[in-house]
Amino acid sequence: MASLEDLIPTVNKLQDVMYDSGIDTLDLPILAVVGSQSSGKSSILETLVGRDFLPRGTGIVTRRPLVLQLNNISPNSPLIEEDDNSVNPHDEVTKISGFEAGTKPLEYRGKERNHADEWGEFLHIPGKRFYDFDDIKREIENETARIAGKDKGISKIPINLKVFSPHVLNLTLVDLPGITKVPIGEQPPDIEKQIKNLILDYIATPNCLILAVSPANVDLVNSESLKLAREVDPQGKRTIGVITKLDLMDSGTNALDILSGKMYPLKLGFVGVVNRSQQDIQLNKTVEESLDKEEDYFRKHPVYRTISTKCGTRYLAKLLNQTLLSHIRDKLPDIKTKLNTLISQTEQELARYGGVGATTNESRASLVLQLMNKFSTNFISSIDGTSSDINTKELCGGARIYYIYNNVFGNSLKSIDPTSNLSVLDVRTAIRNSTGPRPTLFVPELAFDLLVKPQIKLLLEPSQRCVELVYEELMKICHKCGSAELARYPKLKSMLIEVISELLRERLQPTRSYVESLIDIHRAYINTNHPNFLSATEAMDDIMKTRRKRNQELLKSKLSQQENGQTNGINGTSSISSNIDQDSAKNSDYDDDGIDAESKQTKDKFLNYFFGKDKKGQPVFDASDKKRSIAGDGNIEDFRNLQISDFSLGDIDDLENAEPPLTEREELECELIKRLIVSYFDIIREMIEDQVPKAVMCLLVNYCKDSVQNRLVTKLYKETLFEELLVEDQTLAQDRELCVKSLGVYKKAATLISNIL
C-alpha cells in the first residue's frame, strides 16, 4: 500500500485519464471553490500556488471551470534535472523528457525561464511546459475565448492546469465562475441561472468538497456561496467556509463568532484569511511577503490572536490538503467498487457488439452462414412459439396467427347475414325469372340456385382478408427476428428480410387463388342432399309455427285494444263480444301439435304445391285457377276480348314497376326460399371457416417455414456478396470503439487505485 501522500497524485492521474478519454462517469473526489464575484477566490488560489497566474478584470473573468492540480516536487526532483539536461533555454523550441520512461519527448515554446523548478502544463496542449506564469494567464484567457467565445458567456467544459512546484502542497481544486446577480454589459440575461446550474453540477455530487468563500465585509446571511452549499449539503458535512478580507471589516467589528462556528456551524469549520490588496499587486510584492504580512496580522490582532494558528492561507492550504486526503481515502473503496461494476457492464456491452469483424473469405463465409441459420431459426421459432424471447405483455408470432383464425376470421364470417341483401321482391323476381315464359306448378329449384350462389360469394372477402392478415403477421415476424449480432451488419439484415419478404410475396397470390377456388367450388355445385341441409318439410313447419305465433300475438293485441274500448257503450260492447266470439271460434280449432286447421290445410296445400301434387296425386292448381288469377273478379269475356294492340311497351313497364301485393302463396314461397338459403349458407360458412385456415397454413405459413433456410442460402450465400453483406454499421462500430476505449480507461483507473489500496 502506498503512502497517504500518494492519494492526491493518484486522483490527479485518474482525472487526467478521464479527461483524455472524455469520460465523466467516474465521480472522483474534488474540491470546488465557490464564491461571488470579487469575494477573493482568485487571491486565495494564487496565494496557494504562490504565483500570479489567474486573469483579472471586471465582470466575469472565470468563464470556464479551472481544474487546478498542485503537485509538490522536491528541488532535486529528477523531473527538473531531466529537463535541465535536455533544455537549451535560448531555443525557440525545446524538447524535454516525459514523466514516464518510453513516452514521447515533450515540447514547449516560450522565452527563457527564470524559475526552472516551477512550471505549468495544460492538458489541451500535451507536452508543453509554461515556465512563465504570465504565459499561463494568457493561455487561460485564450482557451476560455476559444470555447466560451470572446463575450461574457460561460462554458461547462473545464480547463485542466497542472502546476509543479516545490512551494505547493499536493492539492486539487476546481475554480468555478463567480456568482453574479445582475447581468452587466455583454453578459447574457440569464447569466445568474447559467452560473448557478454550472456550480450545482459540480457541488451536487457527494464526492465533492465545497470551499465556500465569503467576504467579511458582507453579512453572512447574504453569502451566495453558503446558500448554494446548503442546497446540496444541508448538514454542512462537506463544506469548508473561508472568510476573506478580514482586514477590511468596519472598525470595532470582528468575525470571531463566525470563525468559531457559533453563528453558522460547519463540520469542517471556517478559516479566516487576509487577501493581497490591489496595492500589493501593483507594488509587485511577492506572495511570500503577503503571507508573512498575513501571519503578522493575525498574530498581533487583539481578537484573532487567540486563534491565529487556525487562520491564514498557510493553514488553509494544510487544512485543504489533509481534508482532501481524508476525503479521498474514504471514497476510494467506493470508487474502486464502482469501477469494477463499470468494467463488468462495459465487458457485457462489448460482448453484445461482438468482436472485430471477419477479415478473410473463410471467416466471412462462416459468419454469413451462422447469421443466416440464426435468422431462419428465430423466424421458425417465432411462428411455432418456441422462441426464447417470447413477449409476455401481448400476443406475438404464431399466437397472433391463431387469434386471426379463431377470432378475427371466425367473427367476420359469423357477422354475415345471407338474406340481408335479399328482399321479398328479389326472391319473387328470382322465382319468376327462373321459370321464363312457362307457367309453373311448383317452386323451381333453379330459383334457389340463383339466389344462394351470390350469397356464398359473400364469404370470399373475409377469407381473402384472413390471408392478408396472416401474410402481414409473417412480415412482422420477419422484421423482428433479427439478433443483436445481426444488427452490426445492416446490409445483411436488410437482405435477409428482403429474401423472406420476397418468399412471402410469392406465396401470397397462390394462397389467395386457392382460397378463391374454395368459394368457387362451393358455388359450382349446390348440394341440397347434404345431411345438415334443412328439408322443405322442416322449413315449412318452422314457417307455420312462426305464423301461428305471430297470429296469436296479433290476437292478443286486438283483444287488448277491444278491452280498452269498452267505455264506448253497450252497443260497442256487444259488437266487440260478437267479434271476440268469432275470432275465438276461428282460432280455437288447434290440433295436438298446436297447428290450427286452417294453417294445417294451407301448409299441406303448399307442400303439395312445392312438390307438384296433392295427396291424391293430382296437380293442386288447374288451368281455371290460373285463368282466375289473371282475370280476377272481373268479366272474363271482357278479358278475352282485349286485343294485344291495346297494350304498349310503356304499359308493360308500368305493370312491372307497379308490383302487385304478395299473395299468401308468394309469401310462403319467398319465406321458404330464404330459410333454405340460410340453412345452406350456414353449411358452407362452417366449411369455409375450417378450410381457409388449413389452406393458409399449408400454402403460406408451413411452406415458408420449410423453404426459408434453402431460400436464404440460395440467394445470399455467394462469395461475391460476403464483403458487401458484412459492411458494419458505422454508428455501431463507433459505439463499440467507444466501449473498447471506456473499458481501457476503467481498467487503467482500477490499476491506479489498486496500487495505493
UniProtKB/Swiss-Prot annotation:
Known function: Microtubule-associated force-producing protein that participates mitochondrial fission. Fission of mitochondria occurs in many cell types and constitutes an important step in mitochondria morphology, which is balanced between fusion and fission. Functions antagonistically with FZO1.
Originating organism: Saccharomyces cerevisiae (strain ATCC 204508 / S288c) (Baker's yeast)
Name of protein: Dynamin-related protein DNM1
Annotated PANTHER family: DYNAMIN, DYNAMIN-RELATED PROTEIN DNM1
GO cellular component terms listed in the entry, alphabetical order: cytoplasm; cytosol; membrane; microtubule; mitochondrial outer membrane; mitochondrion; peroxisome
Modified positions (Phosphoserine) in chain numbering: S629
SMART domains registered for this protein in UniProt: DYNc, GED
Keyword GTP-binding (UniProt): yes
Bias kind Low complexity: ranges: 567-580
Region called G4 motif, residue ranges: 244-247
Top-level taxon of origin: Eukaryota
Topology of this chain in the membrane: Peripheral membrane protein
CDD domains linked: DLP_1
Family listed: Belongs to the TRAFAC class dynamin-like GTPase superfamily. Dynamin/Fzo/YdjA family.
One GO biological process term: membrane fission
UniProt entry keywords in alphabetical sequence: GTP-binding, Hydrolase, Membrane, Mitochondrion, Mitochondrion outer membrane, Motor protein, Nucleotide-binding, Phosphoprotein
Subunit text: Interacts with FIS1 and MDV1.
